[in-house]
């Protein structure tokens, strides 16, 4: 036996490429245990060195990536093989050492079960096992497992491998009172938990006692558990942490044919540890469909100078036979009409769907035929109709098939979808028995291929397709691609039938296509998916370079894939970026503190980084919620028929943040607060709350569990959620939200996107001068479209209150009502309307043909109305030719001078207010109007008040109550909020006090004026500290304008809003410009006016240079227009009284559109010119520019990206629109990029831009990761001090995420809080400077994406003091400064 090994010898065991020296032995090598005769027949002699340890894989059979197999050059292929050969030869040398140090005996007798456990009696002998194919081999298979290190069990689906074999082993040990600890892996959670539950129920054991399970967060097991089922990932995490298998006596790995990345890495680690420190653990591999020889050779063991393959045991027999059929075998279909299958184009055509539906309808005949009773009547029809399992590739196909089947109303089918995104309650329905006389149809993805067994399935319909996760060669972004399933997978699917009776499998491909085109095996995930988490686990194992260990995998990944993953881990910060570029190792890197954290978290790398940065900046709680929510299925419900309501609800949760992630946080916190206050005490209340708020309760509970799990896991790294309650004033809340948005940008670097600018001139023309914030455009309007205005109004009712519709030829402009006391922004109703278009909601009108209308209205020349512009005003309930009503309500008509004296009555926000003119003329008009109204005998409203209704409402002034013209804003209970249209203020009024307004009082234009200070926008400080303006800015502005008489100078009139300069007179002093005061205080900054405003300004200058009288011509009605008005009235009456008959045509409208809708593009080099789509569930799936005149770049951050099969289009998920702060995209990029190179102008006097990425290779001059390089041109001026501030903030981050004696694990809570506060203040200071950065015209570098373009003499190193002392494992290196000339 071995003497005690030294620490150095143990470390050498675990490092590939090192040999163990100076090993002292006692005794001689033992004889290998004798196996059964069958074992000797199956074993093949393999010469030393010729086994799997020395053989490179056949790369042609397993291409490194599906798209790259034909592109990779021969030299690349040879280097891939070379690295695998090199490290497998090193492994073979280790085996030679292994043979020389084998101990003479086993590990000694295990302690008895009774001594180790309080479970003293496990009634294994009294249990009667079910009669399954494996039952007849019980003794033999247990004996083989005990006699061999590794056994491979191959048997048909349903033979009893997963449920019976672990029990055989358990009972074997119980009968001998010997200790055992058996773990069985399952690829899916549902499989592990359901099998454990089934066994405990069969054996009448308490779940969590002898048998238990652990899936992700949920562990139902105790110290007494002897048989535990768990997912592959859970076991892998346990083994990597322990670096040993000795926690278990038996490891049973089920479904090994599923070549996931986790599965292959688990096999690699188990194989490695079996040969080092865990040689007495028994390993069993099981599957119904695997290439046994490949696995047997992989687990070959050295015996007497030979490599002996692992033992293969065949379980013969099946529960019931399953017959296979192909399209050729189906006689009832017209084969000539079927679309041919193409290997290059995996797709389900409409005719193949129809074949599946027809098959399902034929199963009744088949059931009758099989029962031998063909004369059954409908009343005697089979009460138990066998279930059908249909395999489809994805949710879209499931939904389509679901619609086809549910339309067969009289066929008595119960259709259930089975997909990972389907609500959990619905998933459980597949296990329920159908209603008697009904047939259960399960539409499933490959989730039902293994682990999930529905026992009553008799028929399987297989489209032979799947969606596989692949990694794009160029971008490394993942995408789910439709592809043909492998024969292995299809055979696994076939095995789902025939559990309780004879089964049938229908493969919807032709037999020759199956034989010649369907691949035999699936391409292992390790060859087509990112390797990040695997490489981090390799680094934790500390067994040498990642490529050395991965070379020994069953299907080793390509060397280029390993190199790329190392670079991506350096980009995210899990591996350190070397300060000296020449020291950079492309195949390895030092694990940073962040890397160690990521390796321990059950979330992807970017979400792990989010948690760590959340800890740094004091928003850990929010980041934990986001990470938990994004790791699991989205808890926001977007029902197919109620998608718009679900979207609206999500927008409401996000507030004004425009962030999916913040919506998740707010929804989670609201749910949690409701639970804590007892509102959701009962499950029924909670479910109702979930339905009302479009939240899936089971999923949000899962998020809560993962949140708690993550909180526990990070506590070992001294990261804790701050339990102290901060001062929760409004400014703190908004600052916290901004910091969280910055943290999101840091975590999801480089998923950065900017927007193309809309053409304002074209947009104004497209909207015909309508307000883009309130209006959408429809196209393909039928002739005489104004007849259908009520239909059109009802189509948009779910979006918001329609104020007016203007019909202009084949176009219509739908304008929504805006609350006059809300800030300027694009209305939610406009977003909802554009969302309808995105969701392809059908906008269909029932119409008459133009000829029919003209034919039925005799004696009238109505044809002239075909293209007349008609305005339908719902507020005034009028339908007029456009010119008659166009200017009557336009407030610009009340402007008879560019200088006005006003009283402010209502402040909406900073720079936006209502008031009325107090000159003598206007005062007289208001006085006369008020007197006339209050002399009338007022009549109550004839109908219930509704938003937009114009009426008369009381207002108490100087203790005297009088009535004034008012508009209802909204109704709540027994009161309404009204807006006084002649003064601009608002008030709450009891409903019974509202009175009807006589028609004559609607003729005078509303006298209140709406004002907006021109050429001003919020500063960064205001945007960060408030919703749009900070509380401080709002209070300061209110103090300047309230209770004062102001002088305003009109710059322009845009959509009835006066854009003005505002002056305040104070005593005898000169006038104070209020905009200048706000800028001096740091609340505002200068900006450009919009194109429309500038146009209006020019028009006003022209008008006021002439006589004022010329301004009133537009409102004079023309006789011709009166004639058109009469014809419109006649047509409307004919339509409403049904004189035209019932409409017999349908008109499909196109739209709605808004020309200010923004399209985004990527900042990274590889994706700059790719088309970008934002997933429809995202809040930002619709983005409309509120300020098209502001040309500063705006930025969007995406939590995850994927691309389509062709690589042409990117899909963004969980997006956040960053605040519109000038220079923000450049600042965020510099702050979070691993390496930057500043661009300077030709004279070296100022910075013009920055190149961000991983830097360049000094030896070749090439970019290290060119695909993710980002070139930005600055649109504001940055100084040397700005770059220094960025470095100071990076250094502050490093202090909270570093290892070592001064690392964050050693800091006390007070010091952590102090460092967090410093980081927060530095971050806010970087973005909120007292003086805004100067605007400059962007100037692109003449050599974009080229590194090393700065004279080295101008470059100044900024090395961190601590990084120069030794090994550098900081998260962020300090950027090199470029010195500017004077």
From Swiss-Prot:
Organism from which the protein derives = Homo sapiens
Family classification: Belongs to the DEAD box helicase family. DEAH subfamily.
Any one Gene Ontology MF annotation carried by this entry is: RNA helicase activity
Where the record annotates domain Helicase ATP-binding, the positions are 142-308
Catalysis performed (reactions): ATP + H2O = ADP + phosphate + H(+)
Query: Which portions of the chain have biased composition (kind: Low complexity)?
Result: 47-62
Record bears the keyword Cell membrane: no
Task: Give the residue interval(s) assigned to the motif DEAH box.
Answer: 254-257
In what residue span(s) does the Helicase C-terminal domain sit?
A: 377-544
List of residues binding ATP: 155-162
In this chain, the stretch annotated as Disordered covers 36-62
Provide the E.C. number(s) assigned to this enzyme: 3.6.4.13
Disease listed for this protein: Spermatogenic failure 30: An autosomal recessive infertility disorder caused by spermatogenesis defects that result in non-obstructive azoospermia or cryptozoospermia.
Protein name stated in the entry: ATP-dependent RNA helicase TDRD9
Any Gene Ontology CC annotation: nucleus
| Highest taxon, organism lineage | Eukaryota
Q: Which SMART domains does the record match to this protein?
A: DEXDc, HA2, HELICc, TUDOR
Q: What does this protein do?
A: ATP-binding RNA helicase required during spermatogenesis. Required to repress transposable elements and prevent their mobilization, which is essential for the germline integrity. Acts via the piRNA metabolic process, which mediates the repression of transposable elements during meiosis by forming complexes composed of piRNAs and Piwi proteins and governs the methylation and subsequent repression of transposons. Acts downstream of piRNA biogenesis: exclusively required for transposon silencing in the nucleus, suggesting that it acts as a nuclear effector in the nucleus together with PIWIL4.
Gene this chain is encoded by: TDRD9
Report the locations given in the UniProt record.
Cytoplasm; Nucleus
* Domain Tudor residues, every copy: 944-1004
Q: Which CDD domains match?
A: DEXHc_TDRD9, SF2_C_RHA, Tudor_TDRD9
């Amino acid at each position: 036996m071995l003497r005690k090994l030294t620490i150095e010898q143990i470390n050498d065991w675990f490092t590939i490429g090192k040999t163990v020296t100076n090993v002292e032995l006692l005794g001689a090598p033992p004889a290998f245990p004798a196996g059964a005769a069958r074992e000797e027949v199956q074993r093949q002699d393999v010469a030393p060195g010729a086994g799997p340890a020395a053989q490179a894989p056949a790369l042609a059979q397993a291409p490194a990536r599906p798209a790259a197999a034909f592109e990779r050059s021969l030299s690349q292929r040879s280097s891939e093989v070379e690295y695998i050969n090199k490290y497998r030869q090193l492994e073979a040398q280790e085996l030679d050492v292994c043979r020389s140090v084998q101990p003479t005996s086993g590990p000694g007798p295990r302690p008895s079960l009774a001594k180790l456990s309080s479970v003293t009696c496990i009634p294994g002998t009294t249990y009667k096992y079910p009669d399954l194919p494996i039952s007849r081999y019980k003794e033999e298979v247990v004996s083989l497992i005990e006699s061999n290190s590794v056994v491979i069990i191959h048997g048909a689906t349903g033979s009893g491998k997963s449920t019976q074999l672990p029990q055989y082993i358990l009972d074997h040990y119980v009968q001998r009172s010997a200790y055992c600890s058996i773990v069985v892996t399952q690829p899916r959670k549902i499989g592990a938990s359901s099998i454990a539950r089934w066994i405990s129920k069969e054996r009448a054991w308490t779940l969590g006692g002898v048998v238990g399970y652990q899936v992700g967060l949920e562990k139902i097991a105790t110290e007494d558990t002897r048989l535990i089922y768990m997912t592959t990932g859970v076991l892998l995490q346990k083994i990597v942490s322990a670096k040993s298998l000795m926690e278990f006596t038996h490891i049973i790995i089920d479904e090994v044919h599923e070549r996931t990345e986790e599965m292959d890495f688990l096999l690699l680690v188990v194989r490695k540890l079996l040969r080092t420190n865990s040689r007495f653990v028994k390993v069993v591999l099981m599957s119904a469909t695997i290439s046994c020889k490949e696995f047997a050779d992989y687990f070959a063991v050295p015996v007497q100078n030979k490599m002996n393959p692992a033992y293969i045991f065949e379980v013969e027999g099946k529960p019931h036979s399953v017959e296979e059929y192909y399209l050729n075998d189906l006689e009832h279909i017209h084969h000539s009409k079927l679309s041919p299958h193409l290997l290059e184009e995996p797709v389900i055509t409409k005719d193949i769907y129809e074949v599946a539906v027809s098959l399902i309808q034929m199963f009744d005949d088949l059931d009758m035929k099989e029962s031998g009773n063909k004369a059954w009547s409908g009343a005697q029809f089979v009460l138990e109709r066998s279930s059908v399992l249909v395999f489809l590739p994805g949710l879209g196909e499931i939904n389509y098939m679901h619609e086809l089947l549910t339309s067969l109303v009289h066929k008595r089918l119960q259709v259930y979808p089975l997909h990972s995104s389907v609500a959990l309650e619905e998933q459980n329905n597949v296990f329920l028995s159908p209603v008697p006389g009904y047939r259960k149809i399960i539409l499933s993805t490959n989730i039902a291929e293994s682990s999930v067994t529905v026992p009553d399935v008799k028929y399987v319909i297989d489209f032979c397709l799947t969606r596989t996760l692949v990694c794009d060669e160029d971008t490394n972004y993942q995408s789910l691609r439709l592809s043909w399933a492998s024969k292995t997978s299809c055979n696994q699917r076939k095995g789902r039938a025939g559990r309780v009776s004879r089964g049938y499998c229908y493969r919807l491909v032709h037999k020759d296509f199956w034989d010649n085109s369907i691949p035999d095996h699936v391409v292992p995930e390790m060859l087509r998916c990112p390797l990040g988490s695997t490489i981090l686990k390799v680094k934790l194992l500390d067994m040498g370079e990642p490529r050395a260990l991965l070379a020994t995998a069953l299907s080793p990944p390509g060397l280029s894939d390993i190199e790329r993953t190392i670079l991506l881990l350096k980009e995210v910060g899990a591996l350190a970026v070397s300060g000296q570029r020449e020291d950079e190792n492309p195949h390895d890197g030092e694990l940073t503190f962040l890397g160690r954290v990521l390796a321990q978290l059950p979330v992807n790398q970017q979400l792990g980084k989010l948690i760590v940065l959340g800890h740094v900046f004091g928003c850990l709680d929010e980041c934990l919620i986001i990470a938990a929510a994004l790791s699991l299925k989205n808890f926001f419900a977007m029902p197919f028929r109620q998608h718009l309501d679900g979207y609206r609800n999500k927008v409401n949760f996000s507030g004004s943040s425009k962030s999916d992630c913040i919506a998740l946080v707010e929804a989670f916190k609201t749910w949690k607060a409701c639970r804590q206050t007892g509102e959701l005490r009962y499950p029924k209340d909670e479910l109702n709350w979930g339905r009302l708020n479009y939240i899936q309760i089971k999923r949000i509970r899962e998020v809560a569990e993962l949140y708690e799990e993550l909180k526990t896991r990070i506590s070992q790294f001294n990261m804790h959620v701050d339990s102290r309650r901060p001062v929760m004033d409004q400014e703190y809340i908004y600052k916290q939200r901004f910091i969280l948005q910055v943290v999101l940008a840091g975590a999801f670097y480089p998923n950065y996107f900017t927007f193309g600018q809309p053409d304002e001139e074209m947009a104004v023309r497209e909207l015909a001068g309508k307000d883009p914030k309130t209006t959408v455009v429809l196209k393909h309007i039928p002739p005489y479209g104004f007849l259908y205005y009520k239909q059109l109004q009802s189509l948009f009712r779910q979006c918001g209150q329609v104020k007016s519709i203007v019909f202009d030829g084949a176009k219509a402009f739908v304008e929504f009502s805006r609350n006059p006391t809300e800030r300027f922004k694009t209305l939610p109703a406009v977003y909802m309307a554009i969302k309808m278009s995105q969701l392809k909601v059908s906008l269909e009108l029932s119409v008459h043909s133009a000829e029919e209308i003209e034919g039925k209205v005799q004696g009238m020349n109505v044809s002239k109305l075909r293209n007349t512009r008609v305005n339908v005003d719902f507020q005034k309930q009028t339908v007029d030719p456009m010119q008659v009503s166009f200017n009557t309500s336009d407030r610009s008509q009340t402007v008879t001078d560019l200088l006005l004296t006003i009283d402010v009555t209502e402040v909406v926000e900073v720079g936006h207010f209502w008031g009325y003119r107090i000159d003598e003329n206007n005062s007289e008009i208001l006085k006369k109007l008020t007197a006339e109204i209050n002399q009338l005998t007022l009549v109550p409203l004839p109908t219930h008040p509704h938003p937009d209704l114009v009426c008369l409402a009381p207002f108490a002034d100087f203790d005297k109550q009088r009535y004034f013209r008012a508009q209802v804003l909204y109704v709540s209970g027994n009161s309404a909020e009204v807006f006084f249209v002649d003064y601009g203020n608002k008030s709450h009024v009891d409903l019974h006090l509202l009175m009807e307004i006589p028609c004559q009082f609607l003729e005078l234009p509303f006298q209140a004026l709406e004002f907006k200070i021109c050429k001003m926008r919020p500063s960064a400080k205001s945007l960060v500290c408030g919703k749009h303006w900070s509380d401080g800015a709002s209070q300061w502005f209110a103090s300047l304008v309230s209770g004062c008489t102001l002088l305003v100078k009109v710059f322009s009139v845009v959509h009835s809003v006066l854009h003005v300069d505002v002056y305040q007179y104070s005593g005898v002093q000169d006038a104070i410009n209020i905009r200048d005061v706000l800028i001096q205080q740091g609340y505002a900054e200068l900006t450009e006016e919009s194109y429309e405003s500038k146009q209006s300004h020019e028009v006003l200058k022209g008008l006021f240079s002439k006589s004022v009288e010329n301004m009133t011509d537009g409102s004079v009605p023309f006789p011709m227009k009166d004639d058109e008005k009469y014809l419109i009235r006649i047509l409307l009456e004919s339509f409403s009284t049904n004189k035209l008959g019932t409409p017999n045509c349908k008109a499909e409208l196109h739209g709605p559109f808004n020309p200010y809708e923004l399209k985004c593009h990527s900042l990274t080099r590889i994706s700059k010119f790719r088309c970008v789509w934002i997933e429809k569930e995202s809040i930002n799936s619709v983005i409309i520019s509120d300020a098209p005149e502001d040309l500063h770049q705006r930025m969007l951050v995406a939590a995850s990206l994927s691309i389509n099969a062709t690589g042409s289009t990117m899909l963004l998920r969980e997006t956040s629109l960053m605040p519109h702060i000038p220079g923000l995209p450049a600042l965020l990029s510099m702050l979070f990029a691993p390496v930057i190179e500043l661009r300077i102008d030709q004279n070296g006097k100022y910075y013009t831009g920055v190149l961000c990425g991983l830097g360049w290779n000094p030896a070749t001059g090439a970019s290290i990761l060119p695909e993710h390089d980002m070139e930005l041109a600055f649109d504001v001026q940055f100084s040397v001090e700005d770059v220094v501030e960025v470095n100071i903030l990076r250094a502050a981050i490093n202090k909270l995420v570093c290892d070592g004696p001064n690392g964050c694990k050693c800091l006390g809570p007070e010091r952590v809080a102090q460092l967090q506060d410093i980081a927060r203040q530095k971050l806010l200071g970087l973005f909120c400077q007292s003086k805004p950065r100067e605007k400059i015209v962007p100037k692109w570098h003449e050599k974009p994406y080229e590194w090393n373009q700065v004279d080295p003499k101008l470059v100044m190193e900024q090395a961190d003091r601590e990084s120069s002392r030794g090994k550098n494992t900081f998260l962020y290196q300090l950027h090199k400064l470029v010195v500017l000339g004077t």
